[in-house]
């Protein structure tokens, strides 16, 4: 059964009526209301298109968090072959919130990083809801070093509310691990492409997104803090999260305008959760285009282009 967000109620009602009419139409009793069903389906699709063409930043945040939205594991299955995960940071342990692997992307050998939130109670706990600990970011550095050593492009898929803020994580050097991961990404001699597929929260996101090309799915969000966190700090009132989301400029459209991301990946009407296969295919095409634009650059040119990209952020605001 499809899960609807609160603001999708008008669409939900129309689609419920479509299902009711389909149930009434039976070939056995000669009743056919196909024309009426088709007309109502058209209205529902039109309502959905209009709704998603004018989503507020807060509504986009809810879409980015939709429980049925495709996660890293879904993208990994749809985009890569010969996917071979690597475990552990060689210092403390394994962190399943951040996955690292060797793989092939459309026949080309690559390294892959990505946050995994999980889709069931069991997997969400195992992956810590996509909130990586220091060992996750140290594993990311390890993957980046392997990418550099073997001359493999790096593809990162970002989907996290932020790095895990627990006491143990802080004791093991969370801030240092994030900083080193960000630095490693900026210093890579191979091309790297990052895609924000859902939430891109704070340093936990940018730690694997310091890339030559940064892409965002159409209804993803990318920010220094969650809207709820910003509202709590600024107004001491989490109910103002919608206002915070608007003021923070967290949408792909705003961030493209500011030069923080390089391109937007169009999602199916109604969001990636309505047609994960199409969303994943569009993401793959965007990654291929981004990687193609970086092909042929030597290590020095790759680093210079990346450095220039990040130094330019904010100059035209």
UniProtKB/Swiss-Prot annotation:
InterPro entries: Acetyl_CoA_COase_a_su (IPR001095), ClpP/crotonase-like_dom_sf (IPR029045), COA_CT_C (IPR011763). Acetyl-CoA carboxylase is a heterohexamer composed of biotin carboxyl carrier protein (AccB), biotin carboxylase (AccC) and two subunits each of ACCase subunit alpha (AccA) and ACCase subunit beta (AccD). It comes from Azorhizobium caulinodans (strain ATCC 43989 / DSM 5975 / JCM 20966 / LMG 6465 / NBRC 14845 / NCIMB 13405 / ORS 571). Its EC number is 2.1.3.15. Residues 39-293 form the CoA carboxyltransferase C-terminal domain. One of its GO terms (molecular function) is ATP binding. PROSITE patterns: COA_CT_CTER. One of its GO terms (biological process) is fatty acid biosynthetic process. GO terms for cellular component: acetyl-CoA carboxylase complex. Coiled coil: none annotated. The lineage of its organism: Bacteria, Pseudomonadati, Pseudomonadota, Alphaproteobacteria, Hyphomicrobiales. The keyword Lipid biosynthesis applies. This is Acetyl-coenzyme A carboxylase carboxyl transferase subunit alpha. Component of the acetyl coenzyme A carboxylase (ACC) complex. First, biotin carboxylase catalyzes the carboxylation of biotin on its carrier protein (BCCP) and then the CO(2) group is transferred by the carboxyltransferase to acetyl-CoA to form malonyl-CoA.
């Amino acid at each position: 059964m499809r899960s609807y967000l609160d603001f999708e109620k008008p669409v939900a009602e129309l689609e419920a009526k479509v299902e009711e009419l389909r149930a009434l139409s039976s070939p056995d009793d000669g009743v056919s209301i196909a024309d009426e069903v088709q007309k109502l389906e058209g209205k529902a699709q039109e309502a959905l298109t209009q709704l998603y063409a004018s989503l507020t930043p807060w509504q986009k945040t809810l879409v980015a968090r939709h429980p049925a939205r495709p996660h890293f594991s879904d993208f990994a299955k749809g985009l890569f072959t010969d996917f071979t995960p690597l475990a552990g940071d060689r210092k403390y342990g394994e962190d399943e919130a951040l996955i690292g692997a060797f793989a092939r992307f459309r026949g080309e050998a690559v390294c892959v990083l990505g946050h995994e939130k999980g889709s069931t109670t069991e997997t969400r706990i195992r992956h810590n809801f996509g909130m990586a600990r220091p060992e996750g970011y140290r594993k990311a550095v390890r993957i980046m070093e392997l990418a550099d050593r073997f001359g493999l492009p790096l593809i990162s898929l970002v989907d996290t509310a932020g790095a895990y803020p627990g006491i143990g994580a802080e004791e093991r050097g969370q801030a240092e691990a994030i900083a080193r991961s960000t630095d490693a990404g900026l210093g890579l001699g191979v091309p790297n492409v990052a895609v924000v597929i859902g939430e891109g929260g704070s340093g936990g996101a940018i730690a694997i997104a310091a890339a030559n090309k940064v892409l965002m799915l159409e209804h993803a969000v990318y920010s220094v803090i969650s809207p709820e966190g910003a509202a709590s700090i600024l107004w001491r009132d989490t109910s103002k999260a919608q206002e915070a989301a608007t003021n923070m400029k967290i949408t792909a459209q705003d961030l493209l305008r500011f030069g923080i991301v390089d391109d937007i990946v169009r999602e199916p009407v109604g969001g990636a959760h309505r047609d994960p296969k199409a969303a994943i295919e569009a993401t793959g095409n965007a990654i291929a285009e981004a990687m193609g634009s970086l092909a042929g650059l030597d290590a020095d040119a790759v680093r210079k282009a990346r450095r220039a990209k990040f130094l330019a952020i904010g100059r035209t605001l």
